[in-house]
């Protein structure tokens, strides 16, 4: 049976059982505020990168329960007839504020603030966490890799190392973190990302000789293509690659190294290319790279990097460990009550947060300021008084999605936004070693 285009069942069962219970006891329509945040950053991360909000808005557009889904939920005994009738006409009608995609975040940063009825807020929980926990982890890893690359382009080549759908979202998240292209055709088509790729070792092995394979590739892609030179002997591979390009009337664009001691081989290949007069031919390296391997290649004559497994799996941090908690609700008298979880190691701070980044006189960030218990309108003025840059934007108003917050143009803006946000962090943020967050988070209660 083909999968439904609706995103409403991409959720945990208890979201529906809570809805059913709340409908029965009359609390489903109480106004609530939920926040999505991380209690702390992973030990190896000095900052996080917001990615996935554009995908959330795309998914929210299709978040409704169709008749077949409702019948199945009822037949399974998951929902009652009352809940089934409610879901028939339900669509999210609340408000969502969030950090702009590409922004950096820290401990406690309210990446999303969802306001509406309890029914509105609870039904979205799993989908929001599923998307942001994955995409933020990948974008954060991508940012560390592009830091390590010091301006040399990084390309996503991880499609074969992830679930086919996860690979598409990972490619998008990698772009936000500073990557310049992807090998994944679906991601390139869907999000307007530059697509990259030439040939694998299998193409060389298919032909009777390496030179035959290179001649074929150059005939198809032109002399400016990238030729993989380590199928057999690297030294002879470089000779064959340069000669194949010149036989076609041009200079070779690049060679790719995918095995061996990449630092040593890069120096040898650069010397060989220069000796042959191929001074404009670039060197790209692949082979299970992560930010540490890229940093180790910093002094080598490498021009670009192709990253696969470590990128799409978050480079040791496969989830951003974000949570989604109610921070205030309406009581039986219609009054707003701040609520917080008090359990040790999993406590939360009650009340809506309005977030800003405080900058020092030198233009570098000094702290993440979270104003507690104020409205977004009042909070913006208070942030200005404190010299803090506002971090949240409205993504959904009364159920209406901001169309400018998703799509290929929004993705390009997110990448640019991330580079600006990262550049305003203190130098500690650029360290790859374990350590404290680049800036502290401070809560300030208002009123």
Label the predicted regions:
Residues 1-30, 40-42, 84-93, 102-279, ...:
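Buried, small/hydrophobic-residue-enriched core segments of structured protein domains
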Residues 2-30, 44, 276, 281, ...:
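Gly/Ser/Thr/Ala-enriched C-terminal appendages of enzymes
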Residues 21-79, 147:
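Extended boundary segments
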Residues 256, 283-286:
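Extended hydrophobic secondary-structure segments that form protein cores and membrane-embedded regions
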Residues 57-63, 98-101, 105:
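An N-terminal, globular interaction/scaffold subdomain
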Residues 78-92, 408-409, 425:
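Short, basic/aromatic beta-hairpin or loop at an interaction surface
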Residues 71-72, 140-144, 158, 430-437:
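Short coil/turn segments at secondary-structure boundaries
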């Amino acid at each position: 049976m083909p999968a439904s285009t609706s995103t409403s069942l991409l959720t945990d069962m208890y979201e529906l059982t809570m809805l059913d219970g709340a409908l029965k006891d009359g609390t489903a329509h109480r106004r609530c505020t939920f926040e999505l945040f991380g209690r702390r950053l992973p030990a190896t991360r000095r900052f996080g990168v917001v990615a996935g909000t554009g995908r959330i808005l795309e998914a929210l557009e299709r978040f409704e329960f169709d008749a077949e889904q409702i019948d199945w939920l009822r037949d399974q005994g998951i929902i009652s007839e009352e809940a089934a009738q409610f879901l028939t006409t339900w669509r999210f009608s609340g408000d969502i504020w969030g950090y702009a995609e590409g922004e950096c975040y820290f401990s406690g940063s309210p990446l999303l603030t969802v306001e509406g009825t309890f029914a509105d807020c609870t039904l979205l929980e799993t989908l929001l966490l599923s998307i942001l926990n994955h995409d933020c982890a990948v974008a954060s890893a991508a940012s560390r890799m592009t830091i390590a690359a010091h301006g040399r382009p990084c390309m996503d080549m991880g499609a074969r190392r992830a679930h086919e759908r996860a690979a598409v979202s990972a490619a998008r998240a990698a772009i936000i973190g500073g990557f310049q292209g992807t090998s994944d055709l679906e991601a390139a088509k869907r999000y307007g990302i530059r697509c990259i790729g030439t040939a694998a070792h299998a193409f060389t092995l298919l032909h009777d000789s390496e030179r035959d394979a290179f001649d074929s590739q150059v005939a198809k892609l032109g002399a400016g293509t990238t030729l993989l030179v380590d199928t057999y002997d690297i030294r002879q591979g470089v000779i064959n690659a340069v000669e194949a390009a010149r036989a076609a009337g041009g200079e070779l664009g690049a060679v790719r190294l995918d095995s061996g001691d990449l630092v040593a081989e890069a120096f040898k290949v650069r010397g060989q290319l220069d000796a042959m007069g191929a001074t404009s031919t670039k060197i790209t390296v692949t082979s299970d790279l992560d930010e540490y391997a890229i940093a180790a290649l910093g002094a080598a004559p490498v021009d670009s990097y192709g990253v696969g497994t470590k990128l799409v799996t978050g480079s040791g941090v496969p989830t951003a460990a974000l949570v989604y908690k109610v921070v205030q609700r309406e009581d039986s008298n219609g009054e707003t009550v701040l609520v917080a979880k008090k359990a040790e190691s999993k406590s939360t701070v009650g009340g809506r947060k309005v977030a800003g980044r405080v900058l020092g006189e030198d233009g570098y960030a000094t702290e993440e300021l979270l104003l507690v218990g104020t409205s977004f309108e009042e909070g913006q003025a208070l942030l200005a008084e404190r010299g803090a840059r506002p971090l949240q934007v409205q993504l959904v108003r009364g159920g209406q999605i901001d169309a400018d917050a998703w799509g290929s143009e929004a993705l390009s803006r997110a990448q640019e936004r991330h580079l600006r946000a990262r550049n305003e962090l203190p130098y500690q943020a650029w360290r790859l070693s374990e350590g404290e967050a680049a800036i502290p988070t401070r809560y300030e209660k208002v009123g």
